[in-house]
Amino acid sequence: MKQEHLALYLISFSLLFLFGCANQNTETKGTPLPFYNSADFTPEWINEEDEQYSQIHTIANFSFQNQSGDVINNESLAGKIYVADFFFTICPSICPKMTSNLEKVQTEFANDESVMLVSHTVMPWVDSVGVLKAYADMHGIENSKWHLLTGNTEKIYQLARQSYFAEKEIGLDK
């Protein structure tokens, strides 16, 4: 029961994280995106020239297996913009909605190699590589565009809490 609640909390706090690409066209540069350096999600607009830029929040190193059995880690996504979420394949509530929305993102950016999707399971004891492969096939997930990741439970939860600011309890302690 406790792990189900934790899984739901993690899903509730699934986040979209964007990482800038090194090859930006300055002619089409739009409004810069903010950085989120703390769990309260206060947006900060930091220029590369600012001293704070060297201290921006980043996602910790990770290494998990995707639906094809390939190892996916930070290096696999280096220089990419990626949308990350947390889900589990037997989730009856919000996960199907999130997957449906990410399917639209996959379609929209199908030909853009700089954009990736990464979905971390919060129930790796259920979501094996084979289960993730079946889920990917059922949802038309392109293996080269969207990684469904499984691995060590503690490492996934630690990544969720420390890198993506997902909390054990709803809300933040202030």
Description of each model-found segment:
Residues M1-N61:
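N-terminal targeting signals for export/organelle localization
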Residues T99-L159:
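Structural microenvironment flanking redox-active thiols in thiol-disulfide oxidoreductases
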Residues T58-A60, Y82, M116-V118, S144, ...:
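Envelope-exposed proteins and targeting segments
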Residues N73-L102, V118:
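Short active-site neighborhood of thiol/selenol oxidoreductases, capturing the structured segment around
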Residues T153-K174:
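Thiol/disulfide oxidoreductase modules built on the thioredoxin-like
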Residues N66-Q67:
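Short, acidic, Ser/Thr-enriched surface-loop or helix-capping motifs
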Residues S54-I56, E75, I90, I94-K97, ...:
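Extracytoplasmic/periplasmic, Sec-exported soluble proteins
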